[in-house]
């Protein structure tokens, strides 16, 4: 059995896991308007507006990015647990697997802005090492002087959860005894304008599963765990599953057959027929919500369900990790208040029925599933369970 530490979270809703969970339970939205990513457009984003930790003088220059600053915040939150694992197992037996889609792309965009404005490209301000997706995993390994397996997963919006799945496999295969895992992404010009070009960004707060939904709001953040073969908490990863639609690069298969297969596989591996709570991918796009409602209805029925993206934005490579962290925390508490599904209350009746959580709903969550669906038809599901 692979156990999970109490997770660390940073997002627009706060700088710790406890603050994030409390903020999400309030039902408030933590989105703000920003014009810093396009001179003519103002976007509604989930930006962390607090103070980020500073890098030490020993930190290599290509690690000094906003993405890694968000990650560092979560590292420091579970620092004691990480150091205990390193002391017990040794630096070669602790691995790092992280999901990301951005790495240091915004910092490397600065010289391009200069070129657009002046016609001069300052090569001294561009470092390809910032852009490498492995940058975030290398940062963690360098910070703790680890020599175990260290790599990144970048499968768009499933990156964060698939990093946790990979970490579990590393321990099961006996390549590691503990793994630091999760996901991190920061707001940046490239990603926001890329999504805008697909016409799926909403100028208003996201209304997932509403008949009035217009699209997503982008956010930033990080979710981090320590996974271990030791019983470091009362919650373990019960199972996971992933597959691919092989249908379309930016749209899901509306038959939902592969999403259904993914959910069913995760349930089968866990040896259960259902879960107490499911965290929905819930982007608020026409395509995702249509497919996801069908998949959830046909596999999980009236299970309590909600998405946190309308509150903190879609954090992309961090989303699956943050949402997995919330699921794990719910399992750790014997009398959980469930995260409410925040929207305008006008459910799209053309969708299959989903039991969206109302504010103040309490339930003893012993099992919780998190769902992630990505561009390229990539699907992932993970189940956490309370073991004592």
Task: Name each model feature, range by range.
Residues 1-4, 64-80, 84-90:
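N-terminal amphipathic, basic-rich helices that act as targeting or association modules
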Residues 2-7, 18, 22-36, 40-44, ...:
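Condensing-enzyme catalytic core mediating Claisen C-C bond formation in acyl metabolism
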Residues 6, 24, 96, 140, ...:
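Conserved small-residue
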Residues 32-73, 103-166, 191-193, 197-218, ...:
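Conserved catalytic cysteine-centered active-site region
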Residues 71-83, 134-136, 163, 222, ...:
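Short, well-ordered amphipathic alpha-helical segments that serve as non-catalytic structural scaffolds
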Residues 84-95, 99, 112-125, 139-149, ...:
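Structural signature of cysteine-dependent C-C bond-forming condensing enzymes
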Residues 249-255, 284-299, 317-322:
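Short glycine/threonine-rich loop-to-helix capping motif typified by GTGT followed
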């Amino acid at each position: 059995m692979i156990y999970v530490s109490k997770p660390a979270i940073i997002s627009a809703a706060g700088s710790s896991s406890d603050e994030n969970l409390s903020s999400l339970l309030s039902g408030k939205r933590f989105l703000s308007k920003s014009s810093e990513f396009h001179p003519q457009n103002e976007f509604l984003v989930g930006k962390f507006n607090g103070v980020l930790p500073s890098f030490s003088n020993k930190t290599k220059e290509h690690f000094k990015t906003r993405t890694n600053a968000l990650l560092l915040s979560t590292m420091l939150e579970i620092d004691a647990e990480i150091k205990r694992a390193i002391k017990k197992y040794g630096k070669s037996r602790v691995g790092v697997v992280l999901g990301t889609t951005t790495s240091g792309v915004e910092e490397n965009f600065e010289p391009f802005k200069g070129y657009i404005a002046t016609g001069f490209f300052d090569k001294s301000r561009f470092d390809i090492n910032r852009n490498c997706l492995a940058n975030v995993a290398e940062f963690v390994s360098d910070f703790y002087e680890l020599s175990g397996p260290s790599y990144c997963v970048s499968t768009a919006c499933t990156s964060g959860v698939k990093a946790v799945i990979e970490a579990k496999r590393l321990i099961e295969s006996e390549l590691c005894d503990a793994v630091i895992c999760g996901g991190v992404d920061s707001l940046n010009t490239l990603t926001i304008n890329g999504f805008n070009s697909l016409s799926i960004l909403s100028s208003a707060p996201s209304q997932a599963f509403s008949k009035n939904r217009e699209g997503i709001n982008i956010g930033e953040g990080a979710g981090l765990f320590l996974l271990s073969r030791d019983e470091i908490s009362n919650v373990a990863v019960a199972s996971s599953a992933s597959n691919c639609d092989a249908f379309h690069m930016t749209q899901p298969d509306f038959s939902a057959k592969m999403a259904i297969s993914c959910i069913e596989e995760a349930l089968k591996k866990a040896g259960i027929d259902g879960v107490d709570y499911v965290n929905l991918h819930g982007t608020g796009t026409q395509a995702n919500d249509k497919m996801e409602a069908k998949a959830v209805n046909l596999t999980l029925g009236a299970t309590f369900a909600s998405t946190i993206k309308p509150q903190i934005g879609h954090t992309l490579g961090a989303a699956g990790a943050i949402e997995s962290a919330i699921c794990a925390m719910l399992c750790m508490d014997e009398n959980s208040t469930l995260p409410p599904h925040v929207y305008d209350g006008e459910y799209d009746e053309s969708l299959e029925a989903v039991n969206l959580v109302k504010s103040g709903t309490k339930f003893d969550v012993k099992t919780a599933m998190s769902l992630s669906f990505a561009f390229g038809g990539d699907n992932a599901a993970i189940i956490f369970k309370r073991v004592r």
